[in-house]
């Protein structure tokens, strides 16, 4: 898949499933090659997890996961749009309802309202406006999104203010 090109690991494996590439590189990963949607999530026991991290690119799947985590009472953090940005210093953690200048977050809020969602969850986002459409993703920013999420989750799990 050409979207592998913005990933540090696996970028040379266009056409292969990301989960299988990562499972070969990191033996502790159990690859699940599935489309994340409401049907998949309905049979998935989220309650057994301490925290759920969303790094899905598909809006419908992001909404389904947020709703299921809310229903299950599971802590949840979601990654918003990191593409078309160059400055990792502009990455921040905010409520989904308080992001600014992030088209993906705006779409997520719209869809959450349509579903009658009145809850809240934190997101990792950037205050940097997205640049020109032709610009892809800069690994320095997308990787930093992942590091921000990892730090956020660890701090929450050990009881620190995130």
Residues covered by each model-derived region:
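Adenine nucleotide-associated cytosolic modules
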Residues: 1-162
């Amino acid at each position: 898949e050409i979207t592998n090109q913005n990933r540090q690991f696996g970028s040379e494996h266009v056409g292969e499933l990301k989960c299988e590439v990562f499972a070969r590189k990191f033996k502790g990963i159990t690859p699940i090659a599935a489309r994340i949607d409401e049907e998949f999530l309905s049979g998935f026991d989220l309650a057994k997890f301490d925290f759920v991290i969303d790094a899905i690119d598909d809006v419908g799947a992001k909404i389904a996961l947020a709703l299921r985590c809310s229903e299950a009472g599971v802590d949840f953090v979601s990654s918003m749009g990191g593409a078309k940005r160059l400055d990792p210093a502009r990455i921040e953690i905010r409520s989904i309802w308080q992001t600014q200048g992030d088209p993906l977050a705006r779409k997520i809020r719209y869809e959450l309202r349509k579903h009658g969602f009145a809850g809240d969850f934190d997101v990792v986002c950037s205050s940097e406006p997205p640049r020109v459409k032709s610009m892809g993703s800069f690994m320095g920013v997308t990787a930093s999104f992942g590091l921000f999420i990892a730090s956020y989750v660890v701090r929450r799990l050990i009881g620190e203010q995130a």
